[in-house]
Amino acid sequence: MALVPMVVEQTSRGERSYDIFSRLLKERIIFMTGQVEDHMANLIVAQMMFLEAENPEKDIYLYINSPGGVITAGMSIYDTMQFIKPDVSTFCMGQAASMGAFLLAAGAKGKRFCLPNSRVMIHQPLGGFQGQATDIEIHAREILKVKARMNELMAKHTGQPLEVIERDTERDRFLSAPEAVDYGLVDSVLSQRT
């Protein structure tokens, strides 16, 4: 079990302790770290929905350090980001790869950032299936549809032509923070909080 630091606050009614992530959630900060999978996605979606209900006018800040993960889990986060009223500002710290990069680019325009030593990696969806030939064919068609849809959305969020996205995601493509800005995945590199 991972150790989660506690924060103790003094109030007029005494002391109150929070785990660090709950305290940061009060500041509208959500962390997306590790593999994108269903449990993580459900927690992130729930936090976004809670913050929207609490104040639909204030931005939400999503900090990403992820190697990517399950497409359907990531798409639930993506759809929620697009659906809710508050802007979701995205920050890459460490790495945003695969679905992590996709969600980084999906932040509100002008509010997508990388820290200076972050790296971003884009590529096509990964998948594997075994079974009868007909079932393999069905799954192959489905992953090609998912690939086409993700490329369309990546083109929309980066401003890159679809053909460029299709070419660049054919294999793993790594970008430094400044390269991610040039590509349109993020809007700027932040070296210090202002």
Curated annotation (Swiss-Prot):
Its main location: cytoplasm. One of its GO terms (biological process) is protein quality control for misfolded or incompletely synthesized proteins. The active site is at S98, H123. SUPFAM superfamilies: ClpP/crotonase. It is an enzyme of class 3 (hydrolase). It comes from the Bacteria. Belongs to the peptidase S14 family. This is ATP-dependent Clp protease proteolytic subunit. It comes from Sodalis glossinidius (strain morsitans).
